[in-house]
A protein has these predicted regions:
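C-terminal segment of classical bacterial N-terminal signal peptides
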Residues: 14-18
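Sec-dependent N-terminal signal peptides
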Residues: 4-13
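Mature, soluble, non-transmembrane domains
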Residues: 73-182
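N-terminal, post-signal-peptide region of Sec/Tat-exported proteins
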Residues: 43-76
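Primarily extracytoplasmic ectodomains and periplasmic/lumenal surface modules that are beta-strand-rich
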Residues: 33-39, 44-52, 106-109
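Amphipathic hydrophobic-ligand
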Residues: 20-25
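Hydrophobic/aromatic beta-strand elements that line small-molecule binding cavities or substrate pockets
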Residues: 26-30
């Protein structure tokens, strides 16, 4: 089984944009098996800025992400298994909060996100990676996997940057601050 895909916390990876300079401190993933839908909400977006070039790159990447809110957006091939893909950008407490909604017709499509479905057990699972800081009230940790019942909505939150090395903490800038400087 693969690790939870970087899609969940590196915003630009949803769109096949290389150089994941924009990420989220907190990502909440909610899967609605009854509706065959997955929602991914990212909070506290930031960029690692070492130079003016990084600042410009972050702004350029954000412009690319913003363009993905249109209906004719081009999505990466890894998301081909999802029948509907929608990105919306909300503002909450002066923070930009992307919400990605994906619809699937086959649970196997979730593998692209590192979420696995066992039809015999009617359970979903994701790898337990301690540094991802996965939190949930809906699943249970069984060995190296978080396991969730496959017949009801469940969610989990990831905070993979909680233990970010100090040298990167000093370079971390909230995305709204990066964009405000334009």
């Amino acid at each position: 089984m693969e690790q939870i895909i970087i899609f969940f916390f590196a915003l630009t990876s949803f769109f096949g944009i290389e150089n994941n300079i924009i990420a989220a401190d907190k990502t909440t993933v909610t899967i609605h098996p009854q509706n065959q839908q997955i929602e991914i909400v990212q909070e506290e977006l930031f960029a690692i800025i070492r130079s003016e070039a990084d600042l410009n790159l972050a702004r350029e990447k954000w412009a690319g992400v913003s363009a993905m809110t249109t209906s004719d957006a081009t999505w990466p091939q890894a998301l081909d298994g999802f029948t509907t893909k929608t990105l919306s950008l909300a503002s909450l407490d002066s923070q930009i909060q992307p919400q990605l909604t994906l619809t699937y017709s086959d649970e196997q499509a979730l593998r692209a996100m590192g979420v696995w479905y066992d039809a015999k057990k009617k359970q979903f699972s994701v790898n337990h990676v301690p540094h991802d800081n996965l939190q949930t009230e809906d699943g249970k940790l069984v060995g190296n996997y978080w396991v969730f019942y496959g017949d009801k909505t469940f969610s989990f939150t990831l905070e993979p940057f909680k233990q970010m090395p100090e040298k990167y903490q000093q370079l971390k800038q909230p995305l709204n601050q990066v964009l405000a400087e334009i």
